[in-house]
Protein backbone atom coordinates (compact mmCIF):
# COMPACT_ATOMS: atom_id res chain seq x y z
CA UNK A 1 0.00 0.00 0.00
CA UNK A 2 2.82 2.40 0.91
CA UNK A 3 4.71 1.84 -2.33
CA UNK A 4 1.45 2.05 -4.29
CA UNK A 5 0.76 5.55 -2.93
CA UNK A 6 4.31 6.57 -3.87
CA UNK A 7 3.70 5.39 -7.43
CA UNK A 8 0.39 7.25 -7.40
CA UNK A 9 2.15 10.44 -6.39
CA UNK A 10 4.69 9.94 -9.16
CA UNK A 11 2.01 9.38 -11.80
CA UNK A 12 -0.08 12.37 -10.73
CA UNK A 13 3.00 14.63 -10.69
CA UNK A 14 3.94 13.56 -14.21
CA UNK A 15 0.44 14.26 -15.51
CA UNK A 16 0.33 17.58 -13.67
CA UNK A 17 3.59 18.76 -15.22
CA UNK A 18 2.57 17.69 -18.70
CA UNK A 19 -0.78 19.47 -18.40
CA UNK A 20 0.96 22.71 -17.52
CA UNK A 21 3.29 22.67 -20.53
CA UNK A 22 2.61 23.71 -24.09
CA UNK A 23 4.19 21.96 -27.04
CA UNK A 24 5.89 18.63 -27.52
CA UNK A 25 9.37 20.12 -27.12
CA UNK A 26 8.59 21.59 -23.70
CA UNK A 27 7.05 18.33 -22.55
CA UNK A 28 10.11 16.41 -23.71
CA UNK A 29 12.48 18.76 -21.84
CA UNK A 30 10.46 18.38 -18.62
CA UNK A 31 10.23 14.59 -18.84
CA UNK A 32 11.93 12.71 -16.02
CA UNK A 33 14.33 9.99 -17.24
CA UNK A 34 12.96 6.47 -16.68
CA UNK A 35 16.15 5.51 -14.85
CA UNK A 36 15.51 8.27 -12.29
CA UNK A 37 11.96 7.06 -11.72
CA UNK A 38 13.24 3.49 -11.29
CA UNK A 39 15.77 4.69 -8.71
CA UNK A 40 13.01 6.60 -6.92
CA UNK A 41 10.97 3.42 -6.67
CA UNK A 42 14.00 1.39 -5.56
CA UNK A 43 14.97 3.94 -2.93
CA UNK A 44 11.43 4.09 -1.57
CA UNK A 45 11.21 0.30 -1.32
CA UNK A 46 14.57 0.24 0.48
CA UNK A 47 13.71 2.97 2.99
CA UNK A 48 10.26 1.52 3.77
CA UNK A 49 11.68 -1.99 4.14
CA UNK A 50 14.55 -0.75 6.29
CA UNK A 51 12.26 1.24 8.58
CA UNK A 52 9.89 -1.71 8.98
CA UNK A 53 12.76 -4.10 9.75
CA UNK A 54 14.15 -1.78 12.43
CA UNK A 55 10.68 -1.22 13.87
CA UNK A 56 10.11 -4.96 14.12
CA UNK A 57 13.49 -5.41 15.79
CA UNK A 58 12.67 -2.80 18.44
CA UNK A 59 9.15 -4.15 19.01
CA UNK A 60 9.92 -7.87 18.84
CA UNK A 61 8.87 -8.46 22.48
CA UNK A 62 5.71 -6.40 22.13
CA UNK A 63 4.77 -8.14 18.88
CA UNK A 64 4.79 -11.47 20.71
CA UNK A 65 1.94 -10.28 22.93
CA UNK A 66 -0.38 -9.29 20.09
CA UNK A 67 -2.33 -11.65 17.86
CA UNK A 68 -1.98 -9.44 14.79
CA UNK A 69 1.84 -9.37 15.05
CA UNK A 70 2.91 -12.57 16.81
CA UNK A 71 3.33 -14.41 13.49
CA UNK A 72 5.99 -11.96 12.29
CA UNK A 73 9.44 -13.51 11.73
CA UNK A 74 11.04 -12.26 14.96
CA UNK A 75 8.37 -13.18 17.55
CA UNK A 76 7.79 -16.45 15.67
CA UNK A 77 11.56 -17.13 15.91
CA UNK A 78 11.95 -17.64 12.17
CA UNK A 79 14.66 -14.96 12.11
CA UNK A 80 17.34 -13.97 14.60
CA UNK A 81 17.14 -10.44 16.07
CA UNK A 82 20.75 -9.70 15.11
CA UNK A 83 20.14 -10.55 11.47
CA UNK A 84 16.98 -8.43 11.40
CA UNK A 85 18.85 -5.49 12.94
CA UNK A 86 21.72 -5.55 10.44
CA UNK A 87 19.30 -6.17 7.57
CA UNK A 88 17.33 -3.07 8.57
CA UNK A 89 20.48 -0.98 8.96
CA UNK A 90 21.80 -2.11 5.57
CA UNK A 91 18.57 -1.33 3.74
CA UNK A 92 18.22 2.04 5.45
CA UNK A 93 21.83 2.99 4.78
CA UNK A 94 21.51 2.08 1.11
CA UNK A 95 18.21 3.87 0.56
CA UNK A 96 19.23 7.46 1.25
CA UNK A 97 22.22 7.64 -1.16
CA UNK A 98 20.06 6.06 -3.87
CA UNK A 99 17.50 8.84 -3.50
CA UNK A 100 19.96 11.68 -2.87
CA UNK A 101 22.25 10.86 -5.79
CA UNK A 102 19.94 9.00 -8.15
CA UNK A 103 16.83 11.16 -7.81
CA UNK A 104 17.20 14.56 -6.12
CA UNK A 105 18.10 16.15 -2.80
CA UNK A 106 14.51 16.93 -1.80
CA UNK A 107 13.43 13.31 -2.11
CA UNK A 108 16.51 12.06 -0.28
CA UNK A 109 16.07 14.46 2.64
CA UNK A 110 12.37 13.63 2.95
CA UNK A 111 13.12 9.91 2.99
CA UNK A 112 15.80 10.37 5.66
CA UNK A 113 13.40 12.42 7.79
CA UNK A 114 10.70 9.75 7.44
CA UNK A 115 13.12 6.96 8.35
CA UNK A 116 14.55 8.68 11.43
CA UNK A 117 11.22 9.94 12.77
CA UNK A 118 9.55 6.55 12.29
CA UNK A 119 12.27 4.52 14.00
CA UNK A 120 13.62 6.93 16.62
CA UNK A 121 10.52 8.98 17.51
CA UNK A 122 7.30 7.14 16.66
CA UNK A 123 8.32 3.64 17.72
CA UNK A 124 9.47 4.55 21.28
CA UNK A 125 6.48 6.86 21.81
CA UNK A 126 3.96 4.05 21.29
CA UNK A 127 4.55 2.96 24.89
CA UNK A 128 4.31 6.49 26.29
CA UNK A 129 1.52 8.51 24.68
CA UNK A 130 -1.46 8.31 22.37
CA UNK A 131 0.12 11.19 20.44
CA UNK A 132 2.34 8.55 18.85
CA UNK A 133 -0.41 8.02 16.27
CA UNK A 134 -0.44 11.52 14.71
CA UNK A 135 3.34 11.69 15.12
CA UNK A 136 3.75 8.35 13.34
CA UNK A 137 1.31 9.46 10.65
CA UNK A 138 3.85 12.09 9.55
CA UNK A 139 6.45 9.62 8.21
CA UNK A 140 3.59 7.38 7.12
CA UNK A 141 2.29 10.17 4.88
CA UNK A 142 5.60 10.91 3.19
CA UNK A 143 5.63 8.12 0.50
CA UNK A 144 3.16 9.82 -1.91
CA UNK A 145 5.12 13.04 -1.40
CA UNK A 146 8.29 11.13 -2.34
CA UNK A 147 6.58 10.15 -5.58
CA UNK A 148 5.70 13.78 -6.21
CA UNK A 149 9.16 15.20 -5.44
CA UNK A 150 10.90 12.49 -7.45
CA UNK A 151 9.24 14.04 -10.51
CA UNK A 152 9.02 17.74 -9.60
CA UNK A 153 12.03 18.09 -7.30
CA UNK A 154 10.11 20.36 -4.95
CA UNK A 155 7.38 20.48 -2.32
CA UNK A 156 4.51 22.61 -3.57
CA UNK A 157 0.79 22.83 -2.81
CA UNK A 158 -0.33 19.69 -4.71
CA UNK A 159 2.51 17.67 -3.21
CA UNK A 160 1.67 18.85 0.28
CA UNK A 161 -1.99 17.97 -0.34
CA UNK A 162 -0.97 14.40 -1.21
CA UNK A 163 0.85 14.32 2.12
CA UNK A 164 -2.16 15.79 3.96
CA UNK A 165 -4.65 13.30 2.51
CA UNK A 166 -2.41 10.37 3.44
CA UNK A 167 -1.86 11.81 6.93
CA UNK A 168 -5.58 12.30 7.58
CA UNK A 169 -6.41 8.85 6.20
CA UNK A 170 -4.11 7.07 8.64
CA UNK A 171 -5.77 8.39 11.80
CA UNK A 172 -9.24 6.79 11.39
CA UNK A 173 -7.61 3.71 9.85
CA UNK A 174 -5.46 3.00 12.91
CA UNK A 175 -8.02 4.23 15.44
CA UNK A 176 -10.40 1.62 14.04
CA UNK A 177 -7.76 -1.08 14.61
CA UNK A 178 -7.23 0.13 18.17
CA UNK A 179 -10.97 -0.18 18.83
CA UNK A 180 -11.38 -3.80 17.84
CA UNK A 181 -7.96 -4.87 19.13
CA UNK A 182 -7.74 -2.77 22.28
CA UNK A 183 -7.34 -5.83 24.52
CA UNK A 184 -4.19 -6.74 22.61
CA UNK A 185 -2.81 -3.22 22.90
CA UNK A 186 -3.48 -3.26 26.64
CA UNK A 187 -1.69 -6.59 27.00
CA UNK A 188 1.30 -5.21 25.10
CA UNK A 189 1.41 -2.01 27.15
CA UNK A 190 0.85 0.32 24.19
CA UNK A 191 -0.93 3.64 24.57
CA UNK A 192 -4.00 3.90 22.34
CA UNK A 193 -6.94 6.29 22.48
CA UNK A 194 -9.70 3.77 23.39
CA UNK A 195 -7.75 2.68 26.49
CA UNK A 196 -6.94 6.24 27.55
CA UNK A 197 -10.10 8.17 26.62
CA UNK A 198 -12.73 5.52 25.91
CA UNK A 199 -14.59 4.22 22.86
CA UNK A 200 -16.92 7.17 22.33
CA UNK A 201 -14.10 9.71 22.25
CA UNK A 202 -12.26 7.49 19.79
CA UNK A 203 -15.31 7.29 17.53
CA UNK A 204 -15.65 11.07 17.62
CA UNK A 205 -12.01 11.41 16.61
CA UNK A 206 -12.64 9.05 13.70
CA UNK A 207 -15.57 11.14 12.48
CA UNK A 208 -13.63 14.39 12.87
CA UNK A 209 -10.65 13.15 10.90
CA UNK A 210 -12.93 11.67 8.24
CA UNK A 211 -14.53 15.09 7.77
CA UNK A 212 -11.09 16.68 7.32
CA UNK A 213 -10.08 13.88 4.95
CA UNK A 214 -13.11 14.33 2.71
CA UNK A 215 -12.69 18.11 2.60
CA UNK A 216 -8.99 17.81 1.79
CA UNK A 217 -9.55 15.24 -0.94
CA UNK A 218 -11.62 17.62 -3.09
CA UNK A 219 -8.95 20.34 -3.02
CA UNK A 220 -7.05 18.64 -5.84
CA UNK A 221 -9.64 20.14 -8.21
CA UNK A 222 -9.16 23.87 -7.44
CA UNK A 223 -5.39 23.26 -7.45
CA UNK A 224 -5.68 22.09 -11.05
CA UNK A 225 -4.45 18.57 -10.36
CA UNK A 226 -7.69 16.77 -11.25
CA UNK A 227 -11.00 17.45 -12.96
CA UNK A 228 -14.71 16.72 -12.63
CA UNK A 229 -14.36 12.93 -12.94
CA UNK A 230 -12.14 12.84 -9.89
CA UNK A 231 -14.34 15.34 -8.04
CA UNK A 232 -17.40 13.16 -8.49
CA UNK A 233 -15.52 10.08 -7.32
CA UNK A 234 -14.04 11.89 -4.31
CA UNK A 235 -17.47 13.16 -3.22
CA UNK A 236 -19.12 9.75 -3.58
CA UNK A 237 -16.31 7.86 -1.86
CA UNK A 238 -15.94 10.47 0.85
CA UNK A 239 -19.65 10.67 1.49
CA UNK A 240 -19.94 6.90 1.90
CA UNK A 241 -16.88 6.70 4.16
CA UNK A 242 -18.00 9.65 6.29
CA UNK A 243 -21.51 8.21 6.55
CA UNK A 244 -20.08 4.96 7.89
CA UNK A 245 -18.12 6.96 10.44
CA UNK A 246 -21.19 8.88 11.63
CA UNK A 247 -23.10 5.61 11.96
CA UNK A 248 -20.49 4.54 14.51
CA UNK A 249 -21.60 7.27 16.92
CA UNK A 250 -24.76 5.28 17.59
CA UNK A 251 -24.77 3.11 20.69
CA UNK A 252 -24.34 -0.61 20.18
CA UNK A 253 -22.37 -0.56 16.93
CA UNK A 254 -19.39 -2.18 18.66
CA UNK A 255 -16.30 -3.86 17.26
CA UNK A 256 -18.09 -4.89 14.09
CA UNK A 257 -18.37 -1.24 13.06
CA UNK A 258 -14.69 -0.66 13.80
CA UNK A 259 -13.77 -3.56 11.53
CA UNK A 260 -16.01 -2.14 8.82
CA UNK A 261 -14.23 1.22 9.09
CA UNK A 262 -10.86 -0.52 8.88
CA UNK A 263 -11.72 -2.41 5.71
CA UNK A 264 -13.58 0.56 4.22
CA UNK A 265 -10.53 2.74 4.76
CA UNK A 266 -8.40 0.48 2.56
CA UNK A 267 -11.02 0.36 -0.18
CA UNK A 268 -11.43 4.13 0.03
CA UNK A 269 -7.70 4.83 -0.32
CA UNK A 270 -7.25 2.50 -3.29
CA UNK A 271 -10.27 3.90 -5.14
CA UNK A 272 -9.43 7.52 -4.31
CA UNK A 273 -5.89 7.21 -5.66
CA UNK A 274 -7.18 5.33 -8.71
CA UNK A 275 -9.67 8.14 -9.38
CA UNK A 276 -6.94 10.74 -8.90
CA UNK A 277 -4.63 8.97 -11.34
CA UNK A 278 -7.43 8.67 -13.91
CA UNK A 279 -8.70 12.20 -13.40
CA UNK A 280 -5.32 13.93 -13.30
From Swiss-Prot:
Which EC number(s) does UniProt give?
A: 2.5.1.141
Q: Name one GO biological process term.
A: heme O biosynthetic process
Xref: InterPro entries = Protohaem_IX_farnesylTrfase (IPR006369), UbiA_prenyltransferase (IPR000537), UbiA_prenylTrfase_CS (IPR030470), UbiA_sf (IPR044878)
Q: In which pathway does it act?
A: Porphyrin-containing compound metabolism; heme O biosynthesis; heme O from protoheme: step 1/1
Q: Which reaction does it catalyse?
A: heme b + (2E,6E)-farnesyl diphosphate + H2O = Fe(II)-heme o + diphosphate
Give the UniProt keywords, A-Z. Answer: Cell inner membrane, Cell membrane, Heme biosynthesis, Membrane, Transferase, Transmembrane, Transmembrane helix
According to the UniProt record, which cysteines are disulfide-bonded?
A: none
What compartments host this protein? Cell inner membrane
Pfam families the record matches: UbiA
Instruction: Give the bilayer topology.
Output: Multi-pass membrane protein
Coiled coil residues, start to end: none
Q: Give one GO molecular function term.
A: protoheme IX farnesyltransferase activity
Gene Ontology cellular component list: plasma membrane
Its primary localisation, in coarse terms, equals: membrane
Entry superkingdom: Bacteria
Q: Which residues cross the membrane?
A: 2-21, 30-50, 83-103, 105-125, 131-151, 160-180, 206-226, 229-249, 260-280
Q: What class of enzyme is it?
A: transferase
Coiled coil is among the record's keywords: no
The entry's family comment says: Belongs to the UbiA prenyltransferase family. Protoheme IX farnesyltransferase subfamily.
What more is known?
A: Carbon 2 of the heme B porphyrin ring is defined according to the Fischer nomenclature.
Instruction: Please name the NCBIfam families in this protein's record.
Output: cyoE_ctaB
Q: What does this protein do?
A: Converts heme B (protoheme IX) to heme O by substitution of the vinyl group on carbon 2 of heme B porphyrin ring with a hydroxyethyl farnesyl side group.
Protein name (record): Protoheme IX farnesyltransferase
* Gene symbol of the encoding locus: ctaB
